């Protein structure tokens, strides 16, 4: 028996990285919508207040977003904190293998968007979770919502980890301290809690976060600024640095530095070998490469809302927007990884920006980049938290009236859990690895393929047709990558051989 189509309203809200959690609100009739508005006056309205009393339906919504702005919005959705870990990924794969893997993930991401657009065109649904509902009923919707929620939690965790990692260095620079001191305002754990309570939580408790949508452009600008700084610093930082020759755990004692300076003077061949790039590398940390790349390319839940906002929409036009956005991010990712790697080689840490503190803690350019990135991620966290809270409302409290107590408790509980994760996580690599190995393969590979297989009518494409066979193979690749990545990461943890950069 065919599941009846649902009429959906989708709200497009550009923000720093993630629109993933935008959850559609069912709108079967105008009367029921007015009743729901009375009940859910807080969460139900979304980020931006509507100027019109009539909410848009996907069937009658007239998009007004141009081609260029849609490319900007989708590029903004792709871009995120994942760019900070790509140089570390290149250090553990080599330039050639990294380029191959980055190209493969980009092409596969484009193909999965193609599957999503074809599926949405068949059933007239432009919301990721509702495609899951159309394909597998409530379990499909819940699975998609869970994956999107995990992805958003991973994004918030990575943002808070950047605050934990970078804010002490900014304070150290402003106080003109050569070395960090054991005081509370230099402790990243205290600082991330302080920022969460004083700045993030009050913003997350607001009913409307529309004005924070402007952080969208600011966040993307910060990452472009970061890329320019990385390229510039490649030609300013000499190689070799004594700091670079220690292991990536960040243990830079004075004695080690002196010994290594002596070693460099007596053994120039060692220095030359260190400053020679690797083109193909396999080690225990290579297992993190694909998850980091997958984390960096997740934008699929945003594709359909952006499609809804597009002026004169068509699948072909939206596919061109997706291809162009992925291509732009592909170039930015490769340049950031390449120049970051060629600056520090094997000394690069899992959070690239933190590595520059080993060169010159008082560098003005890097300080400006740090401050800009800190402001961007701090403003982005409450925006990313909003759809996660809404997902919880939709799944657990769908038919209940808005409650301030529940509103506050959900936000506080989420921030508490994420803070605990950030405090006890040894480095950002673990966050990139786990989220990139679980929710990212589901959103990029598995769900688009199986949704397409289920939704596409057999009259148009039989079960054994080439497109459906390719879709199943695509899903199988996703399962394989997820299983392999998780296996390698867990093995790395259990064996205790992990030497992640960026411990603080």
Curated annotation (Swiss-Prot):
It comes from the Eukaryota. Glycans are attached at residues 73, 247, 251, 323. Optimum pH is 8. Changing residue 380 to A: Significantly decreases L-glutamine transport activity. Does not affect cell membrane localization. Removes the cation conductance at pH 7.4. Does not affect the proton conductance at pH 8.4. InterPro entries: AA_transpt_TM. It is a multi-pass membrane protein. This is Sodium-coupled neutral amino acid transporter 3. The gene is Slc38a3.
């Amino acid at each position: 028996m065919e599941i009846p189509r649902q009429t959906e309203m989708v709200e497009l809200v550009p923000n720093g990285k993630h629109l993933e959690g935008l959850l559609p609100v069912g709108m079967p009739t105008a009367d029921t919508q007015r009743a729901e508005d009375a009940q859910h006056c807080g969460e139900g309205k979304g980020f931006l207040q509507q100027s019109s009393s009539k909410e848009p339906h996907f069937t009658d919504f007239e998009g007004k977003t141009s081609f260029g702005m849609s490319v900007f919005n989708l590029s903004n959705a792709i871009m995120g904190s994942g760019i900070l870990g790509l140089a570390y990924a290149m250090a553990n794969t080599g330039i050639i293998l990294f380029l191959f893997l980055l190209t493969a993930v980009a092409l596969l991401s484009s193909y999965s968007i193609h599957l999503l657009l074809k599926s949405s065109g068949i059933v007239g649904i432009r919301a990721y979770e509702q495609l899951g509902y159309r394909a597998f009923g409530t379990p499909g919707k819940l699975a998609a919502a869970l994956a999107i929620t995990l992805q958003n939690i991973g994004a918030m965790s990575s943002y808070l980890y950047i605050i934990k990692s970078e804010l002490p260095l900014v304070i150290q620079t402003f106080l003109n301290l050569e070395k960090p001191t054991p005081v509370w305002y230099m402790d990243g754990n205290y600082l991330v809690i302080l920022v969460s309570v004083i700045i993030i939580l009050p913003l997350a408790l607001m009913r409307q976060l529309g004005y924070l949508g402007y952080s969208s452009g600011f966040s993307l600008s910060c990452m472009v600024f970061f890329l320019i700084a990385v390229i510039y610093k490649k030609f300013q930082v000499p190689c070799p640095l004594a700091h670079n020759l220690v292991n990536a755990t960040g243990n830079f004692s004075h004695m080690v530095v002196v010994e290594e300076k002596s070693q460099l003077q007596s053994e120039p061949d060692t220095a030359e070998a260190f400053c020679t790039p690797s083109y193909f590398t396999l080690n225990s940390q290579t297992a993190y490469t694909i998850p980091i790349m997958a984390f960096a390319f997740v934008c699929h839940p945003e594709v359909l809302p952006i499609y809804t906002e597009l002026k004169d929409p068509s699948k072909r036009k939206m596919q061109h927007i997706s291809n162009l956005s992925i291509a732009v991010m592909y170039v930015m990712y490769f340049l950031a990884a390449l120049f970051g790697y060629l600056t520090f080689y094997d000394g690069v840490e899992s959070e690239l920006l933190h590595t520059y503190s080993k060169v010159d803690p008082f560098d003005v350019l890097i300080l400006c980049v740090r401050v800009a990135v800190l402001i961007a991620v701090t403003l982005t966290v409450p925006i990313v938290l909003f759809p996660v809270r809404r997902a919880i409302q939709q799944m657990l409290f769908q038919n209940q009236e808005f409650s301030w107590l529940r509103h506050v408790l959900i936000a506080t509980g989420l921030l508490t859990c994420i803070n605990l994760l950030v405090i006890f996580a040894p480095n950002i690599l673990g966050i990139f690895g786990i989220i990139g190995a679980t929710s990212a393969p589901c959103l990029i590979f598995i769900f688009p393929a199986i949704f397409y297989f289920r939704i596409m009518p057999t009259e148009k494409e039989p079960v054994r047709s080439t497109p459906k066979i390719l879709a199943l193979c695509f899903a199988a690749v996703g399962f394989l990558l997820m299983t392999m990545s998780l296996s390698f990461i867990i093995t790395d943890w259990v064996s205790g051989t992990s030497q992640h950069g960026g411990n603080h």
